[in-house]
Amino acid sequence: MTHSRTALVLIHPATTTRPELLTAAKQHSSLSGANIEQHLVNKLNDGSLQLQDNSYDVIFYVTPEAADEILFPRRLIGVLAAALRAGGSLHGLYDKYQVDALLSGFDIVREPTYHWQKRAVTASAPVKLAPRQPVSAAGLPRFKRASAPSPAAVTPTLDEVPPAAVDPVKAALLDSAAGDAPIAENDLVVGHDSTPITLLTCGRTQTRRRKACKDCTCGLREENEKEISDTHARQEKLLLGDAVKFSEPELAEIDFTIEGKKVGGCGSCSLGDAFRCSGCPYLGLPAFKPGQPINLSAISDDL
């Protein structure tokens, strides 16, 4: 039974500026003698137009765009492939969408005119499998059971050795009661230890002395710490011995609290001045309150 050829013409909206393109497409040899349906491609893109599968023999896309500048929705290529019958052709799209065409089941045909042709679906014939033949016991492979490995020879222990086979001298050494006696730790100390002792050389006196180890237990660390503390004590004693001491006239010169004295030793700053001259002995210190005792020990290091 033969069916009438059906063709679909999809029109780009810009084709209205060049109507001769639509006229030339309808006169194409692939559309001769076919029932032509024409729709705007926008309706197919927005879903308002639904195409039935295997309904068209030819689909023609008309657009004023150049072949390498055509902008066509790629998802519609699969829709057009489903709407074509096996062996049907699609005209108007070019190599820019060649990969999409191959993935959608088209073959690229370049002669006599460029178009895509839908591949025919090859029917797969079922293959009849031969029934599986029962396998007899005689046909099964035979395997030889490996012999169990012989146990390894076990060396008898001293308790299992007969008394006649034991050397009496060795037995006396092994069974000696002295072997179980505790050993004094002093007996384990080597008389001449080959480990050298770390000695430090003083840069001033050129004398050498031992350095205490990290986990010292012989008292050398305590001895070193005591020597260091004694050295610090002597240094502090020497420093304190050179502390500045003021005589009575010197204290009177700088002391603001002396009764009847209103200015300091500089002769210009009074007791309560917050800003002092460059020669004032209390330059940089806050103003003193009247009657407040002045302690000079806090600034003895600076003086």
Swiss-Prot record:
Keyword Transcription: no
GO biological process: cellular response to oxidative stress; iron-sulfur cluster assembly; negative regulation of hydrogen peroxide-mediated programmed cell death; negative regulation of nitric oxide biosynthetic process
GO molecular function: 2 iron, 2 sulfur cluster binding; 4 iron, 4 sulfur cluster binding; electron transfer activity; metal ion binding
Residue numbers spanned by region Fe-S binding site A: 202-218
Motif stretch (Cx2C motif 2): 277-280
Domain of life per record: Eukaryota
Binding site for [4Fe-4S] cluster: C266, C269, C277, C280
Keywords: 2Fe-2S, 4Fe-4S, Cytoplasm, Iron, Iron-sulfur, Metal-binding, Mitochondrion
Chief localisation class: cytoplasm
Region (Fe-S binding site B): 266-280
Localization in the cell: Cytoplasm; Mitochondrion intermembrane space
Residue ranges, annotated region (N-terminal SAM-like domain): 1-125
UniProt keyword Acetylation present: no
Residue interval(s) of motif Cx2C motif 1: 266-269
Entries under InterPro entries matching the protein: Anamorsin, CIAPIN1, Dre2_N
Region described as Linker: spans on this chain: 126-188
Domains: entry comment: The C-terminal domain binds 2 Fe-S clusters but is otherwise mostly in an intrinsically disordered conformation.
HAMAP family found in the cross-reference section: Anamorsin (MF_03115)
Family the UniProt entry places it in: Belongs to the anamorsin family.
Protein purpose: Component of the cytosolic iron-sulfur (Fe-S) protein assembly (CIA) machinery required for the maturation of extramitochondrial Fe-S proteins. Part of an electron transfer chain functioning in an early step of cytosolic Fe-S biogenesis, facilitating the de novo assembly of a [4Fe-4S] cluster on the scaffold complex CFD1-NBP35. Electrons are transferred to DRE2 from NADPH via the FAD- and FMN-containing protein TAH18.
Quaternary structure and interacting proteins, as annotated: Monomer. Interacts with TAH18. Interacts with MIA40.
Protein name, as recorded: Fe-S cluster assembly protein DRE2
Species this protein is from: Eremothecium gossypii (strain ATCC 10895 / CBS 109.51 / FGSC 9923 / NRRL Y-1056)
Taxonomic path: Eukaryota, Fungi, Dikarya, Ascomycota, Saccharomycotina
